[in-house]
Amino acid sequence: MIKRLLSFLDASPVNFLAVKNISEELEKNGFRRMNPQEPLGKIEAGEKFFVTKNDSSIYAFQIGKKPLADAGFHMICAHCDSPTFRIKPNAEMLCEGGIVKLNTEVYGGPIMSTWFDRPLTLAGRVIVKGENAMSPQTLLLHVKRPLLQISNLAIHFNRQVNDGVKLSKQKDVLPILGIINDELEKGNLLMNVITDELNIQKEDVLDFDLYLADATPACTFGVHDEFISSGRLDDLSMCWAGVEAMIAADANDTTQVLAIFDNEETGSQTKQGAGSPFLSYMLQRIALAQSHTEEAYYQAVERAFMISADNAHAWHPNYSEKFDPTNHPKLGGGPVIKFNAAQKYASDAVSAAIFANICDAAGVPCQRFVNHSDVAGGSTLGNILASSIPLKGVDMGNAILAMHSCRETGSVIDHEYCVKAFTKFYQL
């Protein structure tokens, strides 16, 4: 099981590739790709299908034996984006000695220092000419070799570096791409990489969404190989747990939904984010296809339950003072239910009890997380989604260290626990 997760992480350096890989895995397991531009048609019990939005979010459905109005739906949601650096247009910056660095902007909230002095690569999508102006073609790019690096300033020029350094997002985190060898490469070094990798012509390239990614493969470590080290555990590990559970669960009375959104790290307010009405539209279309009445959708929502799956903070042995004294989850302790008095999480006593029951039925331990009262925490998908679909639900996630680092640390057994809990949820 863990090898499949590591392979998925390595093959999914950005949201677009994560959605591609999830799509292919679903298709291999009997799910049919549907075009949301076309009518759904008749919806049969047991039918399995998925749709995508913007090539960066994906929504999978296994239709229950009972109509949505009668049995509701069980939904797991997660997000496939992670903090990184986006390549700006006109990105090449020529420096002395022919060195070319790339102009970038920060995406989300990365721990920027963790991106220094490690091999990086490029991944994303490239838009090329299509049949007409309104239908350009999308090509996915993943340079599968070390290509760039952000280098630190030597300690000899900054003796206070170990006392803390304030980093400029515009100046200090620009990656080195290469050295120009001849005049023809001037201004074309990045474009040459793109066209060579995709075997296309420069004049066909219209635009791109490209991002930096860690070029080092995901791995396990520890005396017993009990830990996972990888970029993007937040939140691809939860995405993949949802995929594994959706594939493993057989059809039952309740419709099963897996929603993997984009842009959680920047607020979710996009057409492919949790703040979009797209998922609501899809559920309404399914309900209407089954019962031909709008009332069916509203009944389904009242019978539904959502698991919002986004990683939680594991207790850190070097920084124990940052954690709540009685609610600090450990690596290897099972899925974590997240609470917040300011309602940043969807969890309440009822939904938490339901999720704890699910874990118990799956033979899985679970933990609880509350922020230290003097330390502000983040928010996640649950309440954003609930603002458009008023679902009963719980915010949870597996505990990890170094959230938003270029490489995060998780637990092997926690991933196995999570897949078991998610599978049991879909089977109820």
Q: Predicted segments — roles?
A:
Residues 1-428:
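N-terminal hydrophobic/helix-forming segments and targeting peptides
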